[in-house]
Amino acid sequence: MLLTSVLLLSCVGCAQDGRKEPDAEKADLGLTAEVKPATDFTAKANAAVYDELDFDDKQEYEFATRGLIDAPETLELKDEDGTILWSQEAYAFLDDYEKAPDSVNPSLWENTKNNHAYGLFEVTDGIYQVRGYDMANLTVVKGNTGWIVFDTLMSVECSQAAMQLIEKNLGKFPVKAVIISHSHADHFGGIAGVMTKEDKADETLSIEDQLASGKIPVITPVGFTEHSVKENVYAGKGMGRRSNYQYGILLTPGVTGKLAQGIGMGQSTGTVSFLTPSYEITQSGEKLTIDGVE
């Protein structure tokens, strides 16, 4: 009873010691949820980057835009309810500035402009990429009779839109195989936009028999399913929290908000799908011939 009384008195003393509540202290410092312009310190730090890097070197942008075949004037993908799942239109403000605003690191600004280059591109003869339709790229290789698809983006809606762009410009051909490079969701989550579960080849067959069956082999590195679970289930929450701080994912796109995430504009928020592989690559350098392509 005595201990309880002492604790109560201690708490009363804490409330009456003259210190302000945390929210009041933040308000005095100007720490509110409203977007603010760059401080002088931030503006000077960002401006100094122009002296550190050669911004006249446009090679990265030339690489990002070379081989463009087609791109819609605007790109914004929505679900049936009108919810935006992926948007390049949200970054149209990039065209309003000749150089980075003082609120943005110039290197990040250039990276964002590079990632804003979206559409269907020819990489080389017979190899094409859809870029800027999700965090990753969707690549197709032309075989004798159809497409070999490398990586299927994060969301079904995005991969469907990517395949439609390919079909519009290059013709409609069957998918002969899907190859997933690794276990990050932005490389496999859109697989249901490329093929169905019923399309998948029988994993009990040899890869040669799978290819001959008329079904679609799903080819991955060994351990793909295990690592997909470990990374996206076990570590997913921690990775998500880290990326919120790292990239400002919850911010609105803008010069005082969210910009690119290095390898892409960010992750789409559509339907994520998954298929187990029908064939796993177990050794580096293993060679397969798929639809006439080695």
Language-model features, listed with the residues they occupy:
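N-terminal pre-domain segments of enzymes
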Residues: R19-T112, H116
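Bacterial N-terminal signal peptides that target proteins for export
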Residues: M1-L2
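Bacterial signal peptide processing site
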Residues: A15-D17
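Conserved beta-strand hairpin/beta-sheet module of binuclear metal-dependent hydrolase folds
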Residues: K113-F173
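Active-site metal-binding motif and surrounding structural segment of the metallo-beta-lactamase
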Residues: T145-G146, V156-P217
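Active-site metal-binding loops of divalent metal-dependent hydrolases
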Residues: T152-L153, S183, G223
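Metallo-beta-lactamase
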Residues: E122, A212-K215, I219, G223-E294
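C-terminal motif of bacterial Sec signal peptides marking the signal peptidase cleavage site
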Residues: S10-G13
